[in-house]
Swiss-Prot record:
Function of the molecule: Component of the dark-operative protochlorophyllide reductase (DPOR) that uses Mg-ATP and reduced ferredoxin to reduce ring D of protochlorophyllide (Pchlide) to form chlorophyllide a (Chlide). This reaction is light-independent. The NB-protein (ChlN-ChlB) is the catalytic component of the complex.
PANTHER family: LIGHT-INDEPENDENT PROTOCHLOROPHYLLIDE REDUCTASE SUBUNIT N
Record: residues binding [4Fe-4S] cluster: C24, C49, C109
UniProt pathway: Porphyrin-containing compound metabolism; chlorophyll biosynthesis (light-independent)
Compartments in which it is found: Plastid, Chloroplast
Protein name: Light-independent protochlorophyllide reductase subunit N
GO biological process: light-independent chlorophyll biosynthetic process; photosynthesis, dark reaction
Source organism of the structure: Tetradesmus obliquus (Green alga)
Entry annotated with the keyword Transmembrane: no
Required co-factors: [4Fe-4S] cluster
Disulfide bonds: none
Compositional bias annotation for Low complexity: 173-182
Gene that encodes it: chlN
Length: 560
């Protein structure tokens, strides 16, 4: 076992069978329908999906939750019924009973197998219904447990509003109004080739170019092409115009302002172009980018992270998802986005490619170390020096010392289920535990690059071997490795917990970490409580056995 661990000095990645052994991804409905308060989730699947939602979520029928099942029967699967008419009937019933702001269709394995065209039906039905319909595929064939939320947020990101063009131009132009209007500054503008199409229609051209062109310097260049008598020379103190220029100007030190003339209305056009031009490159840093966080968190946890960033002088412009569908954040090229969960790679890709946002690649705010690194990365993007993070992290670790004594030196094995494994492993290594293996259903190394780097750094600082990372692990091989390594704790899915417990392997359900509040500084104890609970149980069993003089410290004999 020692040789096996010593060989792992750097991160190693392996991929085994390619099968998903995880919780069903449609379970994302359980927390998303509570997060988006004016939504309604319609899961389109079979009775199996309905049984899963009823049993796994533990919601009674009379509670009237804001989700429902559209059960597919044999006639639906054999294509004897019109899917559109049936979904239309259900959606109109939902509108009449609940009147939500948005309806989310959740596709399942069945809709994927029979190739239901949900994306094709949704726009037409949306026009008839008058309520937005978001389509997300959360089938267990293609996605792991928590990736159900990823598909929903990726679909919802495309529904986020964009900043109107005139508003965006106005926000950029307001900064330009405060800067110098000298030809030297004008020459530094970003140029976009936009020339006159008809040089004879001067009056029409000027008014058209005033509205069409965002760059005044490019506008002047176009004038030089069609009117040789008009010229601009770069000089710090003056602007030289030829005597035959058709617009009367006056020379002013460092700035030029056209005189309004009743004989020629073109002077007014120049004046507005100068005052409403685009922002210069040297002043681009004055445009304060917005920050949008994506990932579903309980409102209390979201507030905690917001306050942590506010302490650093950073304001959050919005969340994806928002509490109400109408409050979705505005996304544009001046928006920075940062994730709070490691399973949101598809959402991050959509935000970058479709919405042209800038992604902040940071470790995830899980544990004091991860939260500190997450805040530091955001501060670096905004050019702010972090204040008090070292002291805050140290104080949190001191408060966890009673639990750290129990886990320090213990070993843990992740079988893989919820895609939180790398962040949890990094935190537990910082707590003093040894991680033998990190099994994970799916790993996007680009999206989790910062988390992987922090994991490697943590292993180096704690002087422990770097664990092996196995993507889509084979459970049979994992059982063999568990039998060989004999870890103190195995974090696994619900399907494997009881069989492992029957073989004297202490387990913890990974699904509990998904539903627990584990983000931020103050919730680090929640993670340790989940980890130490089975370890404390073993201690109590050992004490019980010693009290009665039993030679067996466990109730079940090893059956390996």
């Amino acid at each position: 076992m020692t040789i096996l661990l010593e060989e792992k000095e750097k991160l190693t990645f392996e991929c085994e069978t390619g099968n998903y052994h995880t919780f069903c991804p449609i379970s994302c409905v359980s927390w998303l329908y509570q997060k988006i308060e004016d939504s309604f989730f319609l899961v389109i699947g079979t009775k199996t999906c309905g049984y899963f939602l009823q049993n796994a979520l533990g919601v009674m029928i009379f509670a009237e939750p804001r989700y429902a099942m559209a059960e597919l029967e044999e006639s639906d699967i054999s294509a004897k019924l019109n899917d559109y008419k049936e979904l239309k009937r259900l959606c109109f019933q939902i509108k009449e009973d609940r009147n939500p702001s948005v309806i989310v269709w959740i596709g399942t394995c069945t809709t994927e197998i029979i190739k239901m065209d949900l994306e094709g039906m949704a726009p037409e039905l949306e026009r008839e219904l008058g309520i937005p319909i978001v389509v997300a595929r959360a089938n267990g064939l293609d996605y792991a447990f928590t990736q159900g939320e990823d598909t929903v947020l990726a679909a919802m990101a495309q529904r986020c509003p964009s900043l109107p063009l005139n508003v965006e131009e106005k926000s950029q132009n307001s900064l330009f109004n405060q800067s110098s209007n000298s030809p030297e500054n004008l020459k530094t503008l970003n140029t976009k080739k936009d020339t006159f199409q008809n040089s004879t229609e001067n009056s029409k051209t000027f008014s058209a170019e005033k509205k069409k062109t965002q760059n005044p310097f490019e506008f002047f260049k176009s004038l030089e092409e069609f009117f040789p008598s008009f010229s601009i020379q770069n000089n710090k103190k003056e602007t030289i115009l030829s005597k035959n220029s058709f617009v009367p100007f006056v020379e002013v030190e460092k700035n030029m302002y056209p005189l309004e003339s009743s004989e020629n209305s073109k002077a007014e056009s120049f004046y507005h172009l100068l005052r409403e031009g685009e922002q210069t490159n040297q002043n681009s840093e004055l445009v304060k980018p917005k920050l949008v966080l994506f990932g579903s968190l309980p409102n209390t946890v979201a507030t905690q992270l917001k306050l942590e960033l506010n302490r650093q002088g950073i304001e959050i412009s919005g969340w994806l998802p928002s509490t109400r569908y109408s409050d979705l954040p505005i996304l544009d090229t001046n928006t920075y986005v940062c994730g709070v969960n490691p399973f949101l790679s598809r959402t991050a890709t959509t935000l970058m490619r479709r919405r042209k946002c800038k992604l902040i690649s940071a470790p995830f705010p899980i544990g004091p170390d991860g939260t500190k690194a997450w805040i530091e990365k955001i501060c670096s993007i905004y050019g702010k020096k972090p204040i008090g993070l070292e002291e805050r992290e140290t104080k949190i670790w001191e408060g966890l010392e009673d639990s750290l004594k129990l886990v320090r030196g213990k070993s843990v094995f992740f079988m893989g289920d919820n895609l939180l494994e790398i962040s949890l492993a990094r935190f537990l290594i910082r707590c003093g535990m040894i991680v033998y293996e990190i099994g994970i259903p799916y790993l996007d190394q680009r999206f989790q690059a910062a988390e992987l780097a922090l994991l490697e750094k943590t292993c180096f600082e704690m002087n422990v071997p770097v664990p092996r990372i196995v993507e889509k692990p084979d459970n049979y091989y994992q059982i063999s490795r568990i039998r060989e390594l004999q870890p103190d704790l195995v974090i696994t899915g619900m399907a494997h917990a009881n069989p492992l417990e029957a073989r004297n392997i202490t387990t913890k359900w990974s699904v509990e970490f998904t539903f627990a509040q584990i983000h931020g500084f103050t919730n680090a104890r929640e993670i340790l409580d989940l980890v130490t609970r089975p370890l404390r149980r073993n201690q109590n069993i050992n004490s019980f056995s010693e009290f009665f003089g039993s030679t067996t410290s466990t109730f079940v004999q090893n059956q390996f």
